[in-house]
A protein has these predicted regions:
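Extracytosolic ligand-binding ectodomains
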Residues: 2-23, 31-399
Length: 399
């Protein structure tokens, strides 16, 4: 993930900041949100229902508001590098901003939905007012049932929008957001007719369906929507070649590891048009492909993650996983809301502030249905790298 500069306050609401070490800022711009009032001069506000039970899991911080976190610290009995990196990011966030406002309780879900549910129950039983995590969709489904039963919100890290719901918010980078950004940019730059070439898998199907829906809402045309089985790109490339004179761009929601074969198939079919993709293309395996030079894709601006990674490496002497900034932002957000949100700091109005928040990867805001909107850049592949051709927005329009 990456960074964004601190956005200005929107409207006439109050902007609250948790200023992080090294210049990182998480901004909480809470227009019309009663849950985002300035902190009292007396310091953190104790929760309306103080937690009296014993703490569970690994704990960080010593604040009055208890927050649970569920991470895949192990998988198949072995340590999980992703889980460890997210745990480290949580520690970094606590040391930066949260030690006096929250007590974070971290439980391992063993990458299992049953264990995720047990972890949620344990943390809620220990007085957690908010659950952060899990990562996997199956775990979110099981853990969110416990959170809903307890009337507590969850900020999860899955990219599967089917697990989002009121009170179950996804902080992750969603396929739908990538598609919306790249299509809107293409249309704003004169592209009116498209082809879609997508793999027959969950990611490709969701992306292609979203592209079709958004194209209709933008009054632009999808001439062909072709799907291919793994390793069988040639036929799809030929279908695109057959309509090449009718299209302005080709959308390819394919993962980085398969893109060399896709690029080869397109080259053999002599397809030459504007290629469009998503953030999974921000990978050397795609950026170095000769056929992909000039392609556009939507992604967070690299500068945010790069700055975070420098601070992470300085503290832990290792490189962070790409998901680490999700854990960092989730803990920072929880700490900031707890510090100034009164007796119910994680209420719906606070979490769904229309002005959103500015974290390590840029601006984001939660929708009432649990999905999110993120500020994304548009990148162009050039010289075996990626350059920003449309910058990440610094704030959201109201509403």
């Amino acid at each position: 993930m990456r960074f964004a500069a601190e956005p200005p306050a929107a409207g006439h609401g109050v902007t609250r900041r948790a200023v992080l070490g090294g210049g990182l800022v998480l901004t909480l711009a809470g227009c019309n949100s009663p849950g985002l009032e300035m902190p009292n001069d007396g310091g953190p506000v104790a929760p309306a229902h103080p937690a009296n039970g014993p703490l569970v899991g690994e704990t960080m911080g010593a604040g009055p508001v208890r927050v649970g976190m569920i991470l895949p610290l192990t998988q198949n009995g072995a340590p999980s590098p992703i889980g460890a990196s997210m745990r480290n990011a949580a520690q970094l966030a606590i040391s930066d901003s949260g030690s006096s406002s929250i007590t974070l309780m971290i439980e391992d879900d063993h990458s299992s939905p049953d264990a995720a549910a047990q972890a949620a129950q344990a943390e809620l039983g220990a007085g957690a007012q908010l659950i952060l995590g899990p990562v996997f969709a199956s775990g979110v489904r099981s853990a969110s049932a416990a959170a809903k039963s307890a009337g507590k919100p969850m900020i999860a890290f899955s990219t599967d929008v089917s697990v989002a719901a009121p009170g179950v918010y996804l902080l992750s980078f969603l396929i739908q957001g990538y598609v919306d950004r790249i299509l809107q940019y293409a249309v704003s730059n004169g592209k009116k007719s498209f082809a879609v070439m997508t793999p027959q898998n969950d990611y490709g199907n969701v992306a292609a369906d979203r592209f079709q829906d958004r194209a209709q809402s933008l009054n632009v045309q999808v001439v062909v929507n072709t799907r291919y089985a793994s390793g069988q790109m040639a036929g799809a490339a030929q279908q695109v070649a057959a309509v090449q004179g009718q299209i302005d761009a080709l959308f390819i929601p394919e993962q980085a590891d398969a893109m060399p074969a896709v690029a080869s198939a397109l080259g053999q079919a002599s397809v030459k048009t504007q290629f469009l993709g998503t953030g999974v293309w921000n990978d050397p395996r795609v950026l170095k492909l000769p056929q992909m030079q000039g392609a556009w894709f939507s992604a967070p601006d690299n500068s945010g993650f790069d700055a975070f990674a420098l601070r992470y490496k300085a503290k832990f002497n290792s490189e962070p996983a790409r998901l680490a900034t999700l854990a960092y932002d989730a803990v920072t957000l929880a700490a900031a809301l707890a510090r100034g949100g009164g007796p119910d700091p994680f209420n719906q109005a606070a979490l769904t502030s229309v002005s959103g928040f500015n974290g390590a990867d840029g601006v984001f805001r939660f929708r009432a249905d649990g999905t999110n909107e993120r500020g994304l850049a548009v990148m162009q592949i050039a010289d075996d790298g990626a350059k920003v051709i449309s910058p990440t927005p610094r704030s959201f329009a109201a509403g």
